[in-house]
Amino acid sequence: MDLLLLEKTLLGSFVAVLVAILVSKLRGKRFKLPPGPLPVPVFGNWLQVGDDLNHRNLTDLAKKFGDIFLLRMGQRNLVVVSSPDLSKEVLHTQGVEFGSRTRNVVFDIFTGKGQDMVFTVYGEHWRKMRRIMTVPFFTNKVVQQYRYGWEEEAAQVVEDVKKNPEAATNGIVLRRRLQLMMYNNMYRIMFDRRFESEDDPLFNKLKALNGERSRLAQSFDYNYGDFIPILRPFLRGYLKICQEVKERRLQLFKDYFVDERKKLASTKNMSNEGLKCAIDHILDAQKKGEINEDNVLYIVENINVAAIETTLWSIEWGIAELVNHPEIQKKLRHELDTLLGPGHQITEPDTYKLPYLNAVVKETLRLRMAIPLLVPHMNLHDAKLGGFDIPAESKILVNAWWLANNPAHWKNPEEFRPERFLEEGAKVEANGNDFRYLPFGVGRRSCPGIILALPILGITLGRLVQNFELLPPPGQSKIDTSEKGGQFSLHILKHSTIVAKPRSF
């Protein structure tokens, strides 16, 4: 009986392989597909390239196969684009055709199968969510309303670092205090709330759950089960943990923030003109029946990840580069002292008249792009790109990091050199006016958080350089800037200890 079962299993596997080969050949005849490594049945290219599809590995494949190539990852088609012209096609010219988002077994859990804004398919739900989120989060009015809070939070960082005797001697992990700052920046906007210190129990609970969510979602470890359905049973434990983390996070958002704001609103007479923070606008949309309670919580979910973490990564990278390039730090400090005057602390309006500071921010976002592959795109229907056929529901990755670090487009791209944005790249902006440089993407699915991230980066880096000489810890000439890439992320591998010596004015 066992022998018969084994024979049936082997026969079934053989037939499955034959069918896969036949389908592959039929598809090959029907489509003119982009080049790429030769796939094998069932597994595609997974056995060749593995799970770790980070920006540098995909860059190596682009050097071999060209500006557009195809990877067959199990049942999924993965198309990688690595040139400015093709990126323009995906993000702008054919922005509608390639405007959807791919499904992913882990992100399906964390977004309720696309009930959020960032990872939903292109269509009416996305347009509605984008509209509802834009007014309370992503307008110049919001910047002007909350920039005083950002300046206060940066000033509090400076004060706390000065109070810490370790900061000026052996150094501190500055990121920890900056993380509190970023949570306060965004929670002021969302809920008109802030956390008093790094020891706040609610802050620590929130930070831990968000960190676990980020670790689970950004890992490449689950790719095999996402790409190859027959291997998905091996992911059951992983997906169970994801579900548990998701439920705990959403319950935390609901109990401590959304419901608390509802109670406060019920005690006040709030008109549309009197809404004070983002969640009031969002709850108003819920009352009108435009969205449901789950949508409200997934909006909060998006902001916790997309706004807080990515900006924090960029701040951390900027500090690391300034520590490792003291001549650039000195030049930036000279600009701040000269144009603002010694002792005048930088404010949001000042950021527009400080060209070298802006160049430092741009260069940080170029060399250390927080989302190096942007958020993946997808075409719902068969499409054409670069003279090739792109089958429906292909995952499209734009290697924005390589666009910004390709020596064919940039002079000595491996160097951290802010001057490039004052010289040969003086007209290049972070808003996507040049398809060699897309730190926030461009087009319909671009990151609307650019309007918040740029001033927060400028204020934070400016205040730190104004008030401190930032140095590596004793015994080190530089700090470690090794990278840790993820599904949609690029952050520093080790949170470095930084010496912050106060300046006297």
UniProtKB/Swiss-Prot annotation:
Its EC top class is oxidoreductase
Report TM segments.
3-23
The answer to whether the entry has keyword Transit peptide is no
Q: Which reaction does it catalyse?
A: (E)-cinnamate + reduced [NADPH--hemoprotein reductase] + O2 = (E)-4-coumarate + oxidized [NADPH--hemoprotein reductase] + H2O + H(+)
Q: Which InterPro entries match?
A: Cyt_P450, Cyt_P450_CS, Cyt_P450_E_grp-I, Cyt_P450_sf
Enzyme nomenclature, EC number: 1.14.14.91
Task: State the compartments where it is located.
Answer: Membrane
Single Gene Ontology BP annotation: lignin metabolic process
Q: What positions does the entry give for (E)-cinnamate binding?
A: 213-218, 306
Q: Which cysteines are joined by disulfide bonds?
A: none
Cofactor dependence: heme
Its GO CC terms are: membrane
Q: Which domain of life is it from?
A: Eukaryota
A single GO molecular-function term is: iron ion binding
Which pathway does it serve? Phenylpropanoid metabolism; trans-4-coumarate biosynthesis; trans-4-coumarate from trans-cinnamate: step 1/1
Q: How does it sit in the membrane?
A: Single-pass membrane protein
Mind telling me which Pfam families this protein's record contains?
p450 (PF00067)
The similarity annotation says: Belongs to the cytochrome P450 family.
Q: What does this protein do?
A: Catalyzes the first oxidative step of the phenylpropanoid pathway in higher plants by transforming trans-cinnamate into p-coumarate. The compounds formed by this pathway are essential components for lignification, pollination, and defense against ultraviolet light, predators and pathogens.
* Protein name, entry field: Trans-cinnamate 4-monooxygenase
Q: Which organism is it from?
A: Populus kitakamiensis
Give the gene name. Answer: CYP73A16
